[in-house]
Swiss-Prot record:
The keyword DNA damage does not apply. Its main location: membrane. Disulfide bonds: none annotated. Belongs to the UPF0053 family. Keywords: CBS domain, Cell membrane, Membrane, Repeat, Transmembrane, Transmembrane helix. This is UPF0053 protein YhdT. It is found in: Cell membrane. The gene is yhdT.
Length: 461
């Protein structure tokens, strides 16, 4: 074989290497959903491409076999051919033949390696990653033909690899396992956010959906003490007065005590009927015909399961009970939805204070019922979560704490701003530089002057 034929063959081998490398990366990178869409649009080449990516492991093996064969061919033919072409160039230098041969060998080896890596591997890989769809449609036919021609060898090689793995007690890994753990998905989302593929709102919503499955109803409930309810012991006029004042759509109806919830009443139905009643009918009106069933579940039910139950039964309110059968609080579909999209306010919530208000770096005013995990996420802290809320944590540290007093946990000073009886309504939390001892201390401080809170909020419930 003369030098010209050798150079042509080297060019063919480099081109084949580039083909197999591009094939390997393209069929891994291409989105199956996009190929399926092309099939529905009538693209015939997409049918063959779908067949290739369905048996991805087999075609990856074919690509790897092709890369190996062409690389070996380049090693066998490329270096000697380039060495023969380069050797005469060093003869005029008067170098000993052994030195001239060694130098020409080194240059030839470096040149063939450069062409193989750059032209045969790196460039095709870059193109395949950026143009995966177009390349997959282009190479699917030739790659399938190569696979069919060398199927016996590919089958033997795959079988031998499985046997070798089995000897060491290992299972062969699937090269196209498309599943990802939750942590991997979170990392992918984070990278997509950094690269501008998704916006911060999308990132926030998807992360909240991951957290959603870890929530229990107790963590998002309206506590028993804050439940607004009407009682059958009230007169109809008293009930209507309470309903008009608070403006809720659905109300729990009790039998005189919040531990005895009879059901719920929807004010839309109630007030719609009131509009068309005579004065005499209004005087005789009672709440009982308007009481509808309400969901009653244990407070530890997962929020996801509760949502499914509410959807199935088409009831938008659930009463939660503790392990002793007493009412611990209630949850509405709005409370559940707010776990994903953040706080939802309607035209009647104008005066409602956000749960968390930012005053500065590491300095917040927040409601006492904000969850510990929210505080940790907000501050980048690691406060122990053996209680549910920041208010509960403060009472655990100092059961006799009063408004105006503070405790110090690690590098954070937490001051109680408002209390309702023994319920902590609002606190001020601030990171203090230079205190990272982790020791909890208690201090009596004067009540702060009223402060104007800025509009930077983290509206979560």
């Amino acid at each position: 074989m003369d030098d010209i034929d050798s150079l042509i063959l080297i060019g063919v081998l480099i081109a084949l290497t580039a083909f197999f490398v591009a094939s390997e990366f393209a069929i891994v990178r291409v989105r199956r959903s996009r190929i399926d869409q092309l099939i529905t649009e009538g693209n015939k080449r997409a049918i063959l491409a779908r067949r290739v990516i369905t048996d991805l492991d087999e075609y990856l093996s074919a690509s790897q076999l092709g890369i190996t064969l062409t690389s070996i061919g380049l090693g066998v033919l490329g270096e000697p051919a380039f060495e023969r072409l380069l050797h005469p160039l060093f003869e005029p230098l008067g170098l000993p033949d052994s030195v001239s041969h060694a130098v020409s060998f080194a240059v030839a080896y470096g040149l063939i390696t450069f062409l193989h890596v750059v032209v045969g591997e790196l460039a095709p890989k870059t193109v395949a990653i950026q143009k995966a769809e177009q390349l997959t449609l282009l190479i699917a036919g030739p790659l399938r033909l190569f696979y069919l021609l060398l199927f016996p060898f590919i089958w033997i090689l795959n079988g031998s690899a499985r046997l070798l793995c089995g000897m060491f007690g290992l299972k062969p890994a699937s090269e196209h396992d498309g599943s990802h753990s939750e942590e991997e998905l979170r990392m992918l989302l984070s990278e997509s956010l950094k690269n501008g593929e998704i916006n911060p709102s999308e990132y926030k919503y998807v992360n909240k959906i991951f957290e959603f499955d870890n929530r229990i109803a107790k963590e998002i409930m309206i506590p028993r003490k804050e439940m607004a309810a009407v009682s059958t012991e009230m007169t109809m006029a008293e009930m209507l007065e309470v309903m008009l004042k608070e403006k809720y759509t659905r109300w729990p109806v009790t039998d005189g005590d919040k531990d005895s919830v009879l059901g719920l009443v929807n004010t839309k139905h109630l007030f719609s009927d009131l509009l068309f009643m005579t004065e005499e009918e209004r005087m005789k009106m009672t709440i009982h015909p308007y009481v509808r069933p309400v969901i009653e579940v244990i407070e530890t039910i997962p929020v996801h399961d509760l949502l499914i139950k509410m959807q199935r039964e088409r009831i938008h309110m659930a009463i939660l009970s503790d392990e002793y059968g007493g009412t611990s609080g209630l949850v509405t579909t709005e409370d559940i939805l707010e776990e994903i999209v953040g706080e939802i306010r309607d035209e009647f919530d104008e005066d409602e204070q956000p749960l968390i208000q930012k005053l500065g770096d590491g300095h917040y005013v927040m409601d006492g019922k904000v969850r510990i995990d929210q505080v940790n996420s907000l501050l980048g802290a690691s406060i122990q979560e053996d209680v549910d809320t920041i208010g509960g944590l403060i009472l655990k540290e100092n059961i006799d704490i009063e408004a105006g007093e503070s405790i110090r946990i690690g590098s954070y000073t937490i001051k109680v701003l408002k209390m309702d009886g023994r319920l902590i309504k609002q606190i001020d939390i601030k990171e203090e530089a230079g205190n990272t001892t982790g020791i909890t201390a208690h201090h009596k401080l004067p009540l702060p002057e009223p402060v104007m809170l800025n509009s930077a909020t983290l509206s979560e419930k």
